[in-house]
Amino acid sequence: MARYTEANCRLCRREGLKLYLKGDRCYTDKCAFSRRGYAPGQHGQSRKKISNYGLQLREKQKAKRIYGVLEKQFRTYYKRADKARGITGENLLVLLEMRLDNVVYRLGYGDSRKESRQLVTHGHFLVNGKKVNIPSFNVSVNDVITVSEKSRATEKFKTFIENPRTLPNWLEGNLENFEGKVVSQPSREDIDVPVNETLIVELYSK
C-alpha cells in the first residue's frame, strides 16, 4: 500500500501551519513546527511571492497530507465529489471525512489520523459487525463502528476510553460498548480542517 514516507514535521513546515499529524506531540514544545516554523531546505527561511496556481496547489497538498491520501486516490475523490449533487468542494471534504480511518480518529481511537489508519489496518475494528481493515473504506449514515472483542482488553484501547475526545455532531459514541455510530453526514461547519476547498476546485477545474 502506497503511503507518505517523508517526516511528518517537514510536511507541516512546508505547508506553513500545524497539520497535527503527530497527535499529542503537536501540542508540546517538542513540535518541530513550533521551533522552526519555516519551510524545510536551504532556502526555507526566504520569503517568496506565491502565484495563484501555487496557492491552489498548496491547498490541495495540505488536504492530501491531513487525510493521508496520495494523488491518484485524491483525484478519484474529487471526480466523485464533482459528479455528486451539491457544492463540489464540500462534497470532497465529506468524502474524506467519511473514510473509516478518519471516523476512527474522530471517535477518539488514535492520537492522529496516521495512528488511526494503522489501527484499522491491523484489524481492530468492525463495521456493522464485520471486520474491515481498509482505511479508505467509506462509511455510511447509520453504520456502527465497534472495537473488536480481542482489542478491547489492550492497554491502548483502555487509554482511549479513559481519555474520550469531544465528538462532532455527526457521530455518536458509546464508550461502555466500545462503539460509535454515524448519525448523519458532516456539514461544512462540522469539518474543522484548515482547508480552503474552493482553491482545490479551482485547481482541478483548469
From Swiss-Prot:
SUPFAM superfamilies: Alpha-L RNA-binding motif. Keywords: Ribonucleoprotein, Ribosomal protein, RNA-binding, rRNA-binding. Part of the 30S ribosomal subunit. Contacts protein S5. The interaction surface between S4 and S5 is involved in control of translational fidelity. The lineage of its organism: Bacteria, Bacillati, Bacillota, Clostridia, Eubacteriales. Belongs to the universal ribosomal protein uS4 family. The gene is rpsD. HAMAP family: Ribosomal_uS4_B. GO terms for cellular component: small ribosomal subunit. PROSITE patterns: RIBOSOMAL_S4, S4. The keyword RNA-binding applies. Residues 98-164 form the S4 RNA-binding domain. One of the primary rRNA binding proteins, it binds directly to 16S rRNA where it nucleates assembly of the body of the 30S subunit. With S5 and S12 plays an important role in translational accuracy. This is Small ribosomal subunit protein uS4. One of its GO terms (molecular function) is structural constituent of ribosome. One of its GO terms (biological process) is ribosomal small subunit biogenesis.
